[in-house]
Each structure stands twice: as C-alpha cells, then as structure tokens.
Amino acid sequence: WRAVIADSVVMSLVQGNEIDIENFTSEEGKGVYLDKEGIEYVERTGTTTDEVQLAADALVADGVDAVFTPTDNTIMTAELSIYEKFIDAGIPQYTGADSFALNGAFVGYGVDYANLGQKTADMIADILMNDADPATTSVETFDNGTATVNTETSEGLGLDLETVKKEPLCTQVNEIVTAESFDDVEK
C-alpha cells in the first residue's frame, strides 16, 4: 500500500501494486483530483504492520491535517496499532469501511449494505420472477453510503459528535466504540 498525505484535507493509503497506483494517479484518480484542487500531498509506503506503523509516524511528523485509508487488508491488520498515533496528534483518520472505525479510526465510510442488499434482491427477483434478461439488466451504482463514527476517537480529537453527525452526505450515521471485532461491541 502507499500512503498519500494531504496537507490540506485528504490523505490516502492505497494498495501498493502498479495497477492501483496507476489508477490513483489516473485522470479518474484521486491524485489528479488533489492536484486539480491544489491540495498538497506526500506519499509513504509500507507492506507490513511494522512499515505501516512507521508510515503513520511519518504522517504525524509531517503534520498532515487528515488521513484517508481506503479498504486495504494491510492497513486493517495494523489499524489497532496506529489509530492512537493519529488521535494523539489530533489528526482525523477517514476510512473506506466501518471495520476501520471499529478498530479506532475516526470515521469509516462505506456501502450502505442494507440498501445494496435490497436493490440486489429486487434485481434477482426481476430476473427470476419476471423473466428479465440478465445480459440487459443495468448495472446499478450508489452515490451515498453509511458513515460509522468512532465516538471515543471523536472525543479524543476534541470533536463534538452532534456537529460531526449534522447534515451528513450519506444515508445514515452510526456510532461505534473501539474494539477488536463487532462481536466485542455491546449492543
């Protein structure tokens, strides 16, 4: 994976293989977006938990304003060992899945799986019950999702949870506390 640090708004960790880095810097990629918006960023690399920890230390030393980590198993494995570094430095970490927020990141933003499941079920029912042609069934995309906010991290960053939840650009905002797994969270 690679760490992309933005001195203004966004920092991103992306898979470190050539295809993903190519996509990240492509016309459709975030690198182009950041450049276009005049947002400064730097890159860090790491392929092990130890290297991810060192990259997190470097991000803190760089004084970045924010971190964004898309869904990545290497980062997920290291999350419980890096999230406190960002809290202590006052750096919010935004991520691509709720499991990262569970493991201490400030916000996990991802697919609204209930909405996705309903739409998928509707498409399958249309094919099975109404003889819709799978080959001509349109591909559906969603432009919103679910934000999961770690309340402990929000507090550690000195952020007011109600302000964080105000006017979200997603279908819902869920609250969670830090734990190793969803089974460990009291319902």
Where are these regions (language model features)?
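An alpha-beta-alpha
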Residues: 1-37, 137-153
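Venus flytrap/periplasmic-binding-protein-like
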Residues: 78, 82-106
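Glycine-rich, charge-decorated loop segments at or immediately adjacent to ligand/cofactor-binding or catalytic sites
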Residues: 52-54, 101-110
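Hydrophobic alpha-helical segments within soluble ligand-binding/sensing domains
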Residues: 1-6, 111-132
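Structural motif
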Residues: 45-60
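Periplasmic-binding protein-like
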Residues: 10-13, 42, 64-75, 94-96
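Hinge/cleft segment of the Venus flytrap/periplasmic-binding protein
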Residues: 126-187
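Solvent-exposed loop/turn segments at secondary-structure junctions
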Residues: 15-20, 48-51, 72-76, 98-102
